[in-house]
């Protein structure tokens, strides 16, 4: 919030915040996700990562919605799914790239029986530019992902089909994932 205050004080008109799909979908079991959705922070199965992304974006919107004095700062949030594509450099530490590196290196012996919403990094970049330049984008949230997520198993199979040896297509039993989720609080 300190950055938003500083930007407003210095006359910046609009800020584009990269949030995440996890700020919209946590706690939702089925159905379509829309920009008005928010992760249910009271849901018992929400990870700390989901909570942190949701709280950060909510704080930004609270600041925007409670501004007083001077020109109002506009906010646009981009909520991407897993972001994949060519990296800018050698740093592969982002959440999506780290996961892919683990798949490629055979570090994940089993995959969850779940789907994963994905988006190309170049599409996310385009959305950021549009969010800054399009008048209608002011004070809106934009979901950046394909309509239907891909299963982790199909992602790994695609990697195998393209010559990678590390990925596993073995699906982890749901009970194992539920047990392991206890430690992600």
Region spans (language model):
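Conserved SDR Rossmann-fold cofactor-binding beta-strand/turn motif
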Residues: 19, 79-80, 84
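Mid/C-terminal beta-alpha module of Rossmann-like enzyme folds, strongest
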Residues: 127-185
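A conserved pocket-lining segment of Rossmann-fold NAD(P)-dependent short-chain dehydrogenase/reductase
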Residues: 40-45, 89-90, 97-119
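Glycine/proline-rich active-site loop of Rossmann-fold NAD(P)-dependent oxidoreductases
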Residues: 69-71, 85-98, 131-142
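Conserved Rossmann-fold NAD(P)-dependent oxidoreductase catalytic core, especially the SDR/UDP-sugar
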Residues: 1-47, 68-69
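Conserved loop-to-helix N-cap of the C-terminal "lid" that shapes the substrate pocket in Rossmann-like
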Residues: 51, 77, 112-125, 141, ...
